[in-house]
Amino acid sequence: MCIRDSRYITNILGHEGPGSLHAYLNEKGWIESLGAGSQSFDKNTSLIVINIAMTNQGAEKTDQIIGAVFQYINFLREQPLSEFLYDEQASLADLEFQFVESASPMGVVYSLAPKLSETIVEDLLIAPYLMKEYQPKKIKEYLNLLTRNNVLVEINSKTAKTTDTEQWFEVPYKLQLGEITVSQVKDFIPLLPTTNPFIPEELALVPRDQVTMERRHNDAKLEIWYDADSEFGAPRSVMSAEIQIKGGIASPQDQVIADLYVGLVKESLKKEVYPAYLAGISYDLRAMDAGIQILIEGFEDKQLRLFRLVLERFLSLKIDDAKLATEKESFKKNISNLALNKPYQQALNTLQELLISTKHEPNKLLANID
């Protein structure tokens, strides 16, 4: 399977924008995440893989989820292929290669050596990013292979009904051959991705000055610091905004409320910020001891656009009860899983809880969720 042709398909299958497979399943409350990619085992065997992490509600709707997956694949198969989407993906891949971050020589050799048998030496470095030839026939050929008769569905669940036990690891499982069971979802209106507004256009480097760090603004409500650094030769920057809350995030209840709200804001932004992620700009929103931090990283050109989007959503989010219930479920799962960490990780967490007043035991956090 050619990487550039499969990438067109997997980028669309894994997209999180309006009308995407991810957006539909997420809005139904059936999934926590969805990702798509290609995997090659040898010259004759390749797969297109869709990984879906389901919610408890979604685990009871596997037939509908699989049905939605094939509805979207059928939609792609029936739609005229979009050359502008391919060109957009190609320009992003070229941008990624142009400003790829340095790696250790050993790491580069380790990753390139297995590809020598299938890639000419001149293309070794650029091959993973190369999307120069638009081949609609090849893309259609791959889409036509994505059928219910040519699929392997794996469902990992604690509540799955099993019939056998694996010989070596003693893992219970069930193997079912034949046509898979799906349920048609009638309220799914699939759409193709639209133009990405976050693709950087201005890539010139800011001249480096002799000042290590400079305060550009300072008053009772706002303080701004700036530092220019072109040492790495890439038009990337980091923007960090800290919103201080009176009294800070101190008690277990404060921590739970802050984490749940941050989770809801992130969830509400998924469709809008996904194009930024594709364009090499990422963000994080996190609760800190003094308040909330918004962190933007990546290509500098469209960072302010993303920052405004995140800040406005943080200040104006309307809480949906169903989304809050899903967020609580995810929060409980994450906190409960801390007990499964490696012993040294648990020891470090306990040490922080003993020494830092704003770090709280998992049971105290769980007690404040409801």
Where are the regions a protein language model picked out?
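Hydrophobic alpha-helical transmembrane segments of multi-pass membrane proteins
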Residues: 9-12, 257
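Conserved small/polar residues in nucleotide/adenosyl-binding loops
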Residues: 1-5
